[in-house]
Amino acid sequence: MNLKTAYEPYFKIGAAISRWNLHTPAHTKLLAEQFNSFTCENDMKPMYYLDREANKKDPEKYNLSPALTFENAIPYLEFAKDNKIAMRGHTLVWHNQTPKWFFCERYNENFPMADRETILARLESYIHGVLDFVQTNYPGIIYAWDVVNEIVDEGAFRKSIWTETVGEDFFIKAFEFARKYAAPEVSLFYNDYETAQPWKRDFILEKVLGPLIDKKLIDGMGMQSHLLMDHPDISEYRTALEMYGSTGLQIHITELDMHNADPSEESMHALATRYQEFFQTYLDAKKSGKANITSVTFWNLLDENSWLSGFRRETSYPLVFKGKCEAKEAYYAVLKAAVSDDSIDKWVPDYSEEDYKLQGMPTPDIKRFRENIWQENEYNYEASYGFIPNLFAYLHNDDVKRDCMLVIPGGGYCMCCSHEGELAAMEFYNRGMNAFVLSYTTDITMSVPLHKQPLEDISRAVRFIRKNASKYNIDGKKLVIMGFSAGSHVCGSLAVHFDDVKDNNPEYADISGRPDGVILSYPVITTGRYTHADSVRTLLGANPTDEELTYFSLEKQVKDNTPPCFIWQTEEDSVVPVENSYLFANALREKKIPFAHYVFPRGFHGLTVANDEFFSGWSGGEYSMEQTMRARFAV
């Protein structure tokens, strides 16, 4: 008995997949054996349809009818056709992952926004083009579309580039266009998160679904259902489910997962119990007629693929499969909600080792290796638990001399977040540089102040790379450091204090620790009013001296020889106040240090390089979490 068979009498069971799943045979086999529906996690969002190059090359030709490309969507559609698996289309209209240039005159971000009628014409043409391509070339494959995604925020319509340029009725227009061009058998959905919250539930029912139902433009409500172990309460969720169901619309559970950062047996049992409780709720609502649930989709296949580890900044174990397609207790709990125990068999994936290898995607010839930057007798941070700070290399396998990027992940000085390591390193590797990720000293317990140890780590790392410049093929080239969040504080500390850090090892004493350039991403800068308190506490302890606070308040420490800096952050950053980047930029200006400073209006803290891999939930580079995992097991 598998999931799709157990739930066939009631509703479709699906999973979201990324391009990495699609190119890993074991994952596609798991999908085909267990599920009868899937969603493309990332590659069918607006930015992947809109052809930037074509539209910018001939803006007059495409002014009212943007050029589209389907190269990202086609592999998923082909897989669905070949394997006879139905698809949910996700998503046509969203405030995220829709390029700003789509809204601008001549498709140029440096031009003013186009007028309402122009943007509506573009929207209609875009929706028509996507639906026509899919329905002509892959008829019957996509059974439902998320037409509009996530337009409600803080008890009102979300302020977005759509409301700024078109107005709050943009979602109605989108549904009008979708209804006009969708095949009769295709269902049209509104999709959102936190849909069980009473304030959001009521607003969606009245202001979003109400007018769409009145105009007969909508067929279903999508409840994303990114759940926590203690939120929402099942009764609150059930109430919302039944209230949406009372509209007569189909209900899809579109992005189901349950964030859980504890992999212990006890915690995974609790996860299983909660999954069974929710699936029992779905079945009860379906059988009683209180909600016409027609599809439930898990938001990816395996724990290791989940977007939550990057989003939550900690490893998450939120799904029902893990590792080599192994079934967790939660898998059997989901089955038990639908069928009797005696009809449930143990799931044993019969896949070869070759099936677990990425296939069909170009893989660069990268020299990857790790090297400790300290000898054991040089490094004595008391809460290291056997960890030694190290560099992980991403080098081109050739003899070409290249510039070097040293990446410093963030993590509040509590950890080195994996999604802020390898993703960034590979971005620069793909642009022709050699790259390294530094796993520096952190303290997940926040009990043993780090003081200058992270600064000494990055100073040694710069010297270590330069000492081995010939081996790494970077001799005579620039070495730039790039940090994220607290990792930016590490980078910034070196930028202003490189002269202070003396290396006692004679092999490194005469090697410069000054980087040639610095990139600071959503940086922690100050220890003053706008500080990130947890970072400062982990670094300096609960009772730092005034001298320590001043030393590590980087806006007060800029020198005449501070390297050139590139700084970026978002206005919406809710973790590190945007004033941090302004403070450092102003200090650089006063010292006449070359710099660039960008503050983007939208975007959350932790965006890293915001590329396809990031938004698909892939992070890689788990090696950066070594000290944290050692501490976890030790403490």
UniProtKB/Swiss-Prot annotation:
Example GO biological process: xylan catabolic process
Residue ranges annotated for the GH10 domain, each copy included: 1-337
Pathway annotation from the record: Glycan degradation; xylan degradation
Gene Ontology MF terms in the entry: endo-1,4-beta-xylanase activity
Enzyme class name: hydrolase
Catalytic-site annotation from UniProt: E150 (proton donor), E255 (nucleophile)
Catalytic activity: Endohydrolysis of (1->4)-beta-D-xylosidic linkages in xylans
Pfam families per UniProt: BD-FAE (PF20434), Glyco_hydro_10 (PF00331)
Enzyme Commission number(s) of this protein: 3.2.1.8
Keyword line: Carbohydrate metabolism, Glycosidase, Hydrolase, Polysaccharide degradation, Xylan degradation
Role summary: B.fibrisolvens is located in the rumen of ruminant animals, where it contributes to the animal's digestion of plant material by hydrolyzing hemicellulose with its xylanases.
UniProt record similarity statement: Belongs to the glycosyl hydrolase 10 (cellulase F) family.
PANTHER family: ENDO-1,4-BETA-XYLANASE A (PTHR31490:SF90), GLYCOSYL HYDROLASE (PTHR31490)
The protein's name in its UniProt record: Endo-1,4-beta-xylanase B
Organism of derivation: Butyrivibrio fibrisolvens
